[in-house]
C-alpha cells in the first residue's frame, strides 16, 4: 500500500487541494457576508500552512526515494543504516514536529470557534473552554518538546545504529503511545463539546439535526486520529520485521492525513450554506422518523417541507444569536 510513489504523491496533492478549497471557501464566505475574522480563522490558516509544509515534505521524500520505496531491511536491522534511511528519518522527525503543531492548531481553531459561538451565552461552557484551550495548547507544546528531546542530549542517536537508538531514545516509543492516545481523547472531547448546546437550542427539530450533523463532521478528525494511532502502534511493533521505509512512509502519510482531514472538519461548521444543501434530504428523513407521532398528525404540511436556506442558522452570527436566545429563555423559565 505504501510502496506506491505515484499514489502517495496523488493522495498528498488531492488532500492539499481539498483543504485549500475549504479554507478558501471559508474566507470567501466571510468576506461575502461581511463578517469579522476571529482567532479561529487565523489559526486554521496557520494549520493550513503547516499542512502545506507536510505535503511538500511528502512529495520531496518520494522524489528522493526515502518514502514510498522499500529498503529491504527492518528499521532496527544494522544493515538498514544507509543514507537513504537516514534521509527518511530526518523527514520523519520533521513530520512529527510539524504534524503535532498542525494538529494542535486545528484543535485550537475549533475551540476558539466554540468560544465565539457559545461562550457568551453559556457561563459554564465559557469556564470549561478556558481550561480546555489551555490544556490543548500545553498538549501541543509538550509533545513538540518530547519529539525534540526524545533522545535527550543525544539527538543524533535517532539517525545512528540500532544500539545507539535503543540506548539513548528509550522513551520515544512510550511517548509516541501517549501522544496518539491523548490525541484521540482530545479529538473526542472537542467533538462532543457543542452537542449539549445544540440540543438545547429552541429551533425546529430538522434544523437542530442539521446543525448537529455539521458539527459532527469533526468525527472525521477522530477517525483519522484513531487510524494514525493504529498505524503507529502496529509500526512500532513491527520494527523488527517490517521494511524500514514502508514503516516511516505509513506514519508520515497518516500524519499528513490527520492534519488535512482536521482542517476540512474544522471548516465544516462555517460552510453551512454548502452543507445544508447536501444534508437536507437526510435530516428530513431523520426528523420525520423522530417526530412520527402526534406532531406529524397536527402539522403534516410542515413535515413535508425541506428547510429552506433562510430558515437555517446559516452563519456564525445567527447560530450565536440562537444560542443566546435559547439560554435567555432557559434562564427566564
What are these regions (language model features)?
Residues 1-320:
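Extracytosolic/lumenal membrane-interface segments
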Residues 314-333:
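Fungal low-complexity intrinsically disordered segments enriched in serine/threonine and acidic residues
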